[in-house]
Amino acid sequence: MVLGIAGLASAVAAYAVVSFVQVARQQHGVAEHAEEIFRSPASFVAGNPDGDVSVVAFFDYNCPYCREGAPDLAKLIANDGKVRLVLKELPVLGRDSETVAMIALASIPQGKYLELHQRLFTEPGRATKEKALRIASSLGLDTAKLEKEMQEPAIKGAIAANRELADNLGVEGVPFYMVGDKAVPGDSDGLYDALVARVADVRKTGCRVKC
């Protein structure tokens, strides 16, 4: 569809209104749900747990854009020892994604979550239960224990809580990133630089909520 000047102006204005509403909803959601976003005991924190800036990532192990962005997140915490990276499973791409998210969360007590998380993104092909358990076994995790504990109500509850939180924040898809109290576009191109710039901005201007 080709728009005339008036039509184009109307479309741009409508997009601006929608964007403003989305941003306003997210900012309200962040203020109301800061504790769940930044300090939920069910979310794994990589990097420096006591860091001065929180970066939050909502992701699905079968999301190609999440896969592309994962190295930038790893690079960020490797290069900045004061960043705390809060990882939130948000499986939206089917049963495989949900099962793998459950396995990943069940690995936290065994102390190998981050290694499993990174391998799930670096190994080619779709993330499935079989692949997740194979990787877990290669990392020395007790897979029988994983299969049992992934069914615990706390694991399913953590995923349900992430879904509810995402809805409250107006998250419309994955990946979804936040640095401090503001969203960062999930586009893979330039993600690392965008994260670094936003981290620097938070350090300079602070965060409107307890991040």
Which residues does each PLM region occupy?
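Structural alpha/beta surface segment adjacent to cysteine/selenocysteine redox centers
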Residues: 51-62, 67-137, 142, 147, ...
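Short gly/ser/thr-rich secondary-structure transition/capping motifs
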Residues: 35-41, 158-160
